[in-house]
Amino acid sequence: MSNSVKKFEPQKVVIADVDGIQYDVTKAVGMFSYYEDIYQPFVTANMLMVDSGQNFIGNLPIQGGEEVTVKLKNVKGEAVEYNLRVQKIVNRSVERNMQYYTLVLTSKEGLENDTARVTEKYKANAEAIVSDVLKNVLKTDKELFAEESQFKMSVFPNGKKCHALVQSLMYKTVSKSTKFNKGASTQGTQSESELGGNNVQKSSGTAGYLFFENKDGFIFQSMDRLCSDGTDSFGGTGPVETYYSRPSVGMPPDQVYYNIENYAFDGDIDMSEKLNNGIYSTHMCYFDISSQKYEEYTYDMSKTFNNMSHLGSQITLAKYQKELAKRPSRVMSILLDHEAWYSGEDIANPEEGGDAQFPDYAKYYTAQSIGRRYLMDTHKVQIQIAGNSDLKVGDKIKIMLPNMVAEKLREEQPYDEEASGTYLIAALSHNFAFINDAGSPEFFTNLELIRDTMGIKEYDSKVK
């Protein structure tokens, strides 16, 4: 790939000590790598320092918690700024009169999360709880992008850390856009499972949220919205960019910029993992300790597949997966208590006409959120592209990968219609090489992409 599409311009790197005095360390920075991950709550970064006679560690001194500000201009000449805090120092070594070490950085909230404890009891929807925790406990001024949920919940945090509380809510939260069959069993809903006999009912719907930080702020949204391109009820967004795996020779820079420099598949279709986690089918045993009522449900993903958002054009589970879904590969036992937060004298269970404001909705999220989470990263691919600081985790991009067939056949269909298509950015690193063997600073981006199904949206998938 042409170096012209990788160039960036360092502006200033400043470390502010505990008294707020700023030190310009721009000339000592060898490499700055910024990280985001949808499975991690806070952004992080690594900054390689090549310290020649300054001894910043001893003279500032660096004690931890110092504010680091990195200012630069990206490939497009746009101003970019990162504000982080020193978490720790690693890989420190001395060679002649040079010190080499790496500053591990994180967001301010990433450090203060360990001291912020949630003690207040909440009675609200999950997104309202998360919003209050971030604003009034973690004291962040960053924006929260939250999706509206269906059920209210009563939560007593008992002094949990902010992220620990949010994490406990993620898999209990059901999007308001989710559709499922509420209420008691109805005729014709018996499961094909051999477990539990003819009284086993089917569990339906989809559930589960993710919480993470990206360059825009904090995200608390359902996995289905993250996988939605906006054409379904979950109201997601379409791909922000399209990248191609193709030769760069002779191409103008504006086209080279959207080339995939290299890519590698990182595990595809791990059937054993999926079966061990009960992705395709789970047998759920529920016992309400207040009413002494026992029920069994079977979650069959093949029956609820079309209630989810999908990144590919595949419209059903693969044939063998549907066969496996007929018999649960996991059995779970769950205690319910509809009356935990109910003080009335009548029945609390809303399925039996009760009016509890905060019933136990475990039937509607336990198996569903597990299935949604592990289906989400069925296909993984890692790509390297020219630096694009506009990209963030939670975005979707479209990639076009070559059709690995004979050259004559490739002329008719140049791209792989199953492996290509829309992917979710699950993790990324923006890598700024301040010191480079080639001379000028270079910026490249590594992306970890995931998706749940195969196929390009514009074409029918071959999966049957």
Task: Briefly describe each language-model feature range.
Residues 1-114:
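Assembly/oligomerization scaffold segments
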Residues 33-61, 244-464:
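An acidic/polar, Gly/Ser/Thr-rich interaction patch typically located in mid-to-C-terminal regions
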